[in-house]
Amino acid sequence: PWLWMHGLKDYQRDRLVLFLDPSKDPLGGGYHLLQSTVGIGSGGVLGTGLLQGQLTKLRFIPEQHTDFIFSALGEETGFVGCLLVVLGFAALMARLLQVARNARSDFESLVVIGIGTMLMFQVVVNIFMTIGLGPVTGIPLPFLSYGRSAMVVNFIALGLCLSVVRQSRRSLAQLR
């Protein structure tokens, strides 16, 4: 109670209230989250088809090219498309863990684990945000959201991981 009244500013309290119940302000701060969940739900199992989603085409889903790309994906490709994206990120993380295990040094291993953690944090926060399990943030979905700086950083990070793979293969070849 004390932290709520004195530790948080008004806009921070409003964000927490809207995270817990976005219907308190459906045309204001809760609009993004409500439209996002409606978009994902309207996709059903197989979706409406690429570029065929009504909420997406009519731009009811705000920021659908950046923060809410998963909502647009859910509407147009449905549960199956969302599941494939999540499985793709899980496969990427599994591969990064394998790369970390095979790295030449602890430093390289920790770099790869850090990059994997960074990417998975972004994925989890973005997906949780779009399905209503987390507060609305500005974190993009790696490799899918429009955002040049985030995309460049993510590709540089994967480039570092590929360098670790190359170095570990080179040292393995020298051992043979």
Residue ranges and their predicted role:
Residues 1-84, 103-111:
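Hydrophobic, glycine- and aromatic-enriched re-entrant/interface helices and adjoining loop segments
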Residues 5, 86, 118, 158-163, ...:
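Hydrophobic alpha-helical segments of integral membrane proteins
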Residues 60, 72-75, 115-119, 147-150:
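Transmembrane helix-bundle signature of multi-pass membrane transporters/permeases
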Residues 80-94, 113, 117, 121-124, ...:
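Lipid-exposed faces of alpha-helical membrane segments in multi-pass integral membrane proteins
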Residues 83-86, 94-108, 113, 173-176:
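Membrane-proximal intracellular helices of multi-pass ion channels
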Residues 90-101, 161-169:
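Structural signal for the C-terminal ends of transmembrane alpha-helices
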Residues 99-138, 144:
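Loop-to-helix entry and N-terminal half of a specific, functionally important transmembrane alpha helix
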Residues 124-176:
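A juxtamembrane structural motif centered on a specific transmembrane helix
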